[in-house]
Amino acid sequence: MSQLDTWEWFGNRTFHYSQFEPLAALREARERSATTVSVCLPARNEAATIGQIVRVLRRSLLERSRLVDEIVVVDGGSSDGTVAIAQSEGAVVHCEGDVLPEEGPGSGKGEGLWKSLHVCHGDLICWIDADIRNIHPRFVYGLLGPLFTDPGIVYVKAFYERPIRERNALRATGGGRVTELLARPVLN
């Protein structure tokens, strides 16, 4: 593939959340597809952010626009109140150790992602991080949009230009490197 073909491929397969606003058309596309959607947040000790994330997504995407059907938190053994906060904001919460206990314990975020497949009820699962400090519903509908508007798309991976902490400094950009350097080229 030439460099020009590569850039054309990226251009044709890169979406911006604003392409799916207003949400009414996206909701109609979802309803026509009869597809159910779960938003899942694997979490461990995210009390500082989980409440705001669940509240914003519940109000906007579950109650107002009805774009998603459930918000699920899969907790990896939090000791800081994450579970209680997520439940109080309306999320369905499952503890990793209670899901497929016969498989034994795993470790890290991967366990939460894997076990969420067994507790989420949606035909689609939209995973988002539980430590997002600037949450906005567009983080979810920007991922769902391509799936509901282009039948040839079966997988969507977000990338963000966001600040990243390196050593003791905060760089203005730098997030999204794994997606840009590995995921997108491999999935091509």
Region annotations inferred by a language model:
Residues Q52-V56, E111-K115, G142:
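Well-ordered alpha-helical segments embedded in enzymatic catalytic cores
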